[in-house]
UniProtKB/Swiss-Prot annotation:
Physiological role: Specifically methylates the N4 position of cytidine in position 1402 (C1402) of 16S rRNA.
Signal peptide: none
Entry's family note: Belongs to the methyltransferase superfamily. RsmH family.
Identification of the protein by name: Ribosomal RNA small subunit methyltransferase H
Amino acid sequence: MEHITVLLQEAVDGLAIRPDGIYVDGTFGRGGHSRLILQQLGPQGRLYAIDRDPQAVAVAKEWQDPRFEIISGPFSSLHEYMAERGLLGKVDGLLLDLGVSSPQLDEAERGFSFMNDGPLDMRMDPLHGESAAEWLLHADVDDIAWVLRTYGEERFANRIARAIVADRVTTPYTRTRQLAEMIARVVPNKEKHKHPATRSFQALRIHVNQELKEIEETLKASLSVLAPGGRLAVISFHSLEDRIVKQFIRQQEKGIQPPRGLPITEDQIRKTQTLHSVGKAIKPADSEVSDNVRSRSSVLRVAERLGG
């Protein structure tokens, strides 16, 4: 399936692009958001894109635009990337699209999906870290169950984990379809239009790539890289991601909440308020969902950096 960028116009509109501004696309993917940002930048504008997927980086390196630079690595290193370029506190907008791109899902060799059989890998960067198959080969049954329950909200986590550990003695799980078929056997299929393995595959992908930790670290880093008035736009694809983003923005809006009785003034509290939420959460229109079913769970949140 061709990759269709989700909430494309809405996310870029949320950045309130200035032609001479400095912007960061923290998740280049196949370049949908970056392309639209560049269209709105003037000759003095700059766009830095980040991705740890070698295939995405290869696509970006083909772009011939002096205003654009691709950075290879995890977006959680945002602070370091901008510090190296002397851009701390100077970025006018940061965009994070937390979804897995369609090429990643559709390419069987990447091991993200059970729709096509492939090696059980799931790494965003296949050159580093431990694959899903490698982890399942040695992980404790309780650890596997915790990952499935916490990151996939899987009700039958214990049952699946026990089956994995029992089977791996003679037949380790190394293929996507092999794992999906086992899950389909042990989990009741009560959700229409959703494969029983969907939640488990999400959980394993999040664990293998440390996705939630990456998001938390990047959101914290946004405070040091954004200029006063700079925008943060984040597209989430499931409740775990969106909860982190929503709570982060809410916490930064409130600032410190001292225990009652401490002699802290309203002005002192105001100085710790770093973000202001811009509008309400945005979901894709029905027309977008009908054109791209993978957009149905997406949510966009936008916030503005205070200060100045």
